[in-house]
């Protein structure tokens, strides 16, 4: 994601 730490895989915010 944009600020993704984990959700980057889903292209989310990674919260």
UniProtKB/Swiss-Prot annotation:
One GO location term (cellular component)? extracellular region
Q: Which domain of life is it from?
A: Eukaryota
| Native source species | Ranoidea caerulea
Localization, per the record, is:
Secreted
Function field = Caeridins show neither neuropeptide activity nor antibiotic activity.
What are the record keywords, sorted?
Amidation, Amphibian defense peptide, Secreted
- Which of the residues bear the PTM Leucine amide? 15
Which tissues show it? Expressed by the skin parotoid and/or rostral glands.
Which cysteines link up through disulfide bonds?
none
Name of this protein: Caeridin-5
Give the GO terms filed under biological process for this record: defense response
């Amino acid at each position: 994601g944009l600020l993704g730490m984990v959700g980057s895989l889903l292209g989310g915010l990674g919260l």
